[in-house]
């Protein structure tokens, strides 16, 4: 069953038509590389598929409840006004687990002052849920992703406001990888990565359990990751 279907999509800026009559569909675990010459409208098509831009023709249908993550080529505006550090931004992905953690700490404090079998049972249930949902692993995941994307440990406390545009894009990529959306759309994800980080990302995406759409000028990277290719041609 398709998680996304686009029918007869077209987009124009004034009289300048980028593309027309684009029809595609995505199944779960598809890994699609979107290719085409510069200026053909690849980014515009990604925005339309992600629901971030209304195409001038056609329609896009997405599965109900589909979680979607989108990596822009530049993420400067994504973090405008945010005062988090690099590590704190990663922690936002796990807000639910952190609330559970705080609840468990409160139960522990109460148990230390006034023990009761009922309270101990409640703590046991909370601990089981926390473990089941990955509560004892999420900080390990964060460290793995940050190191993989080239952030040394001494950079994790750096405020987002002090990062370069390329570093902010890497932070956004890391956050998306931790969020694990069902559909992950990546526009030139290797642009701000060194060779080691590109290789790490390649391995991560090859193991990805969701659906991918990737635009990349690195055809070797695409060949290693995707199992389908969409080619966008200039509008006639």
Each language-model region and where it sits:
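ABC ATP-binding cassette signature C-motif
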Residues: 1-236
